[in-house]
Amino acid sequence: MSIVIDDKKITNINILNKNVQKIVDELTGKIIFEKTKPVSNEYFYIENTYNGSNTISLKTTIGSENITGSHATQLQYSKDKETWTTITLSGTNKIPMNSGERVYFRNDSGSFNWYNSSNQEDSFYTQINCSNNHKVGGNINSLLDYNNHNVAITPYCFYQLFYNNKYLTDANELIFSKTSLADYCYESMFNGCIKLTTAPALPATTLAPYCYQYMFNGCTALTSAPELPATTLSSSCYSGMFGGCTSLTTAPELPATNLELYCYYGMFGGCTSLTSAPELPATTLAPNCYRLMFRNCTSLTTAPSLPATTIAENCYGEMFWNCSKLTVVPTLPATTLERYCYHRMFRECTSLTTAPSLPATTLAEYCYGEMFYGCTSLTTSPVLPATILVQECYQNMFNGCTSLNNVTSYANDISSGKEYTFMWLNNVAATGTFHNLGSATYPINASGIPSGWTEVKN
């Protein structure tokens, strides 16, 4: 074999490797040409696991007829990795599959989806569905550039890719980027995939805003979550990620020690089979970081430790709301609070019999608002050592705690009209003891000391 390069005829050419093409002069050992091809099993593929025919549907939403260039994506597909057919993603493209057949996909434009949440006319994104059961695998980045699987991830590039795909059962062999991600890149990717039982590995250690937001939301057959090794988080990176995964029994480790805005917001909300929570070692918090994280996790019995001593606005807000089997709660060591920091934290935890100590003496607006609302098994309040109250700091704090019969407070004044204790002891036990260890004067009602209770002064 011989070729001509730069007017020079070179003989004795040898192709060294089927995956890495090298043209080598065997006499000099000089590499004349080299091109890395993707390993064959790393093309993104869809495999028909149904015992019969199946049809792939690629539904593309184009916000405006004027979207062109890198957003007007063409894609190639093949059933043998030799013969490739080019399709333009517009409307719905359909590809038939026989039983057991795989269809491979590739692209070399470096761009796939684009979605503009503030102007949907400037949007272009494709959703993949099939008419029967199937699995997906290979390197997802071959949908961006099959010649370079380390291609830079672009914002929204795989947004809603399998959204509401009712027949996707397995994504375990799907390969994701190990490098840094981009804003919204995997948002809602598997959202609503009700048959999905296995998820792909997510090896990235540095995240981007909203990158995994709602990624597996509503995957009701998913029993285990992928490992999440990231230590550098970003705002809303895991927000709603496993929300409504009602078969999920265990959660992945979350090793990050520095949190970001909304990073774990609603992450496991509605995971009704989750029996244990991951350790939460973070000591640097951010506003809303844990908000709604385990809401409606009705099988959760023990809360993780929360070691942070410096907290942030709404950081624990609604964190365990309606965890109806929760009996063990964490120590809350912070002594200086922020607005809404514990707002509704244990609301409707109906099995909770013992509340955590609340050592804080410097309060903030709404800090304990509705914290134990509806905790019907709670009999004794934690000691409330703060002498100076702030706006609605205790509002509805114990409302609906029908077994509560013992409260201790050091407050010195509740008369400023800022509703410090608004309805805080509404619908509690008919009789009880109120330990007034401060100098405050309380009215006899649900916003003070309940009628039928005994006040014991210091």
Q: Where in this protein do the model-derived segments appear?
A:
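Viral virion structural and adsorption modules
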Residues: 1-37
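Solvent-exposed loop and capping/linker segments of extracellular ligand-binding repeat ectodomains
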Residues: 33-458
